[in-house]
Each structure stands twice: as structure tokens, then as C-alpha cells.
């Protein structure tokens, strides 16, 4: 990520030496135990989707905490791993909204400008939210703040109470916010199913003269 636009803009937004603090944190936790995703995938969302190309943001909470699931992209898992329940529901809603998608690795979304960002970028094995409140939130809030300053439209898709709290960071009238309940089985029937976030995001992008995302790719 070094030498990227992300690095330059985030360095301006964050307190001095914050990248050093993140590296020290990662040195410590990866040394002490099993952490997901693999260290070389921690910044995958920013590497797969350069700042200049971001058109949609889908905000998650933290990575999957089981073996071989997390790949540094919110909600996504490799094709070789069964889709977790939230991802099953995301693809179910996509099927109702725009049609069936035959695979569940979301890397092709990231390659089209969909930033798949978790608020925490690491998690200890088997401990959901185990790194919450330790280092990541100022960093990922800074990601949202620099995107808020973009001149081109960005659609922020916020699922669930945690993600929806971040909408206060999105103040630029050029951008759109689409929010609903979380796709988790605990809440999907309370407003996620039927919310049509994918077609709504595309409708906004097209209305602003931007190409739509091919969500089925």
C-alpha cells in the first residue's frame, strides 16, 4: 500500500506515526497467536480497490474468524470455502434483486471499484470482535473520511447498527447512503431481505453519469 494514493491521503488524515503503531500492533499479535486474515492480506481491500476507482463501499465489522475464510475483503471468502451465513443471505438478496451469481468470492466486485472494507482489519482465531477498539477504527474511519472528500460519487452501503453509525462521516452531498438491517440470519428478515441495495447503488451511479457495477460478475 506504500506509495499509493491511499497511503498519502491516510497519512494526512491520521495522527503522526499511526502507520508505525499499526505495524507494531501487527508484529505483536501475529507473533502471539493465530490471527486472520494472513498478514499479507490485511490491507487487501485497499490494494484491490485503489482510491481513484472507488464507486461503492460495503462496510463490515471485522474479518471472519475461522480458518481460511478471511481474505481481507468484507463478507467475502475464497471460492474453495463454503459461504458463511451472512454471505449466503447477501447472495440470496442479490438473486432476488438482479439475478443469480454463481460464485461467492467477491474479488471481482473489488476489482470494479467496490471497496469491501471491515472496520477492524484483523481478528484473533475464534474470537469475533477480538481486536475491536484496539487500533483499527481510527484508520478505517480515516478511509471513510478521505472517500467523503472525493469529487466523484460514491455509494456507501451500510448494513446493521454498527455500520450505520458511520454515516455521520459521510457529509458530501455527491455521495449516497443505502442502509438496512444486517444480512446475518439474526436480522436479515428485519429489513435486509427486499432492500435491493445492488440495483439501488447502480441506479444512483448511472444517475450521476457513472457506469454501473456488474454485481453478477
UniProtKB/Swiss-Prot annotation:
Presence of the UniProt keyword DNA damage in the record: yes
NCBIfam families: PRK05254.1-1 (NF003588), PRK05254.1-2 (NF003589), PRK05254.1-4 (NF003591), PRK05254.1-5 (NF003592), ung (TIGR00628)
Entry protein name: Uracil-DNA glycosylase
Name of the gene: ung
Record-stated family: Belongs to the uracil-DNA glycosylase (UDG) superfamily. UNG family.
Catalytic site positions: 62 (proton acceptor)
Lineage: Bacteria, Bacillati, Bacillota, Bacilli, Lactobacillales
GO CC annotation terms, alphabetical: cytoplasm
PROSITE patterns (UniProt xref): U_DNA_GLYCOSYLASE
GO biological process: base-excision repair, AP site formation via deaminated base removal
Entry's EC annotation: 3.2.2.27
Gene3D superfamilies xrefs: Uracil-DNA glycosylase-like domain
Keywords: Cytoplasm, DNA damage, DNA repair, Hydrolase
UniProt cross-references to HAMAP family, sorted A to Z: UDG
Source species, domain of life: Bacteria
Molecular function per GO: uracil DNA N-glycosylase activity
Catalytic activity: Hydrolyzes single-stranded DNA or mismatched double-stranded DNA and polynucleotides, releasing free uracil
Amino acid at each position: 500500500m506504500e506509495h499509493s494514493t491511499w497511503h498519502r491521503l491516510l497519512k494526512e488524515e491520521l495522527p503522526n506515526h499511526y502507520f508505525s503503531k499499526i505495524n507494531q500492533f501487527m508484529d505483536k499479535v501475529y507473533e502471539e497467536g493465530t490471527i486472520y486474515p494472513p498478514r499479507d492480506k490485511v490491507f487487501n481491500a485497499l490494494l484491490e480497490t485503489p482510491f481513484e476507482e472507488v464507486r461503492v463501499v460495503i462496510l463490515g465489522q471485522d474479518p471472519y474468524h475461522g480458518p481460511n475464510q478471511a481474505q481481507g475483503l468484507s463478507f467475502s471468502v475464497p471460492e474453495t470455502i463454503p459461504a458463511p451465513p451472512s454471505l449466503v443471505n447477501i447472495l440470496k438478496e442479490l438473486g432476488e434483486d438482479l439475478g443469480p451469481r454463481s460464485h461467492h468470492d467477491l474479488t471481482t466486485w473489488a476489482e470494479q471499484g467496490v471497496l469491501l472494507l471491515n472496520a477492524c482489519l484483523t481478528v484473533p482465531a475464534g474470537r469475533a470482535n477480538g481486536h475491536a477498539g484496539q487500533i483499527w477504527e481510527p484508520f478505517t474511519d480515516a478511509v471513510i473520511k478521505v472517500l467523503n472528500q472525493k469529487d466523484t460519487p460514491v455509494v456507501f452501503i451500510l448494513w446493521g447498527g454498527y455500520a450505520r453509525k458511520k454515516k455521520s462521516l459521510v457529509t458530501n452531498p455527491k455521495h449516497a447512503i443505502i442502509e438496512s438491517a444486517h444480512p446475518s440470519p439474526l436480522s436479515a428478515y428485519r429489513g435486509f431481505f427486499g432492500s435491493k441495495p445492488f440495483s439501488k447503488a447502480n441506479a444512483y451511479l448511472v444517475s450521476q453519469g457513472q457506469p454501473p457495477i456488474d454485481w453478477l460478475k
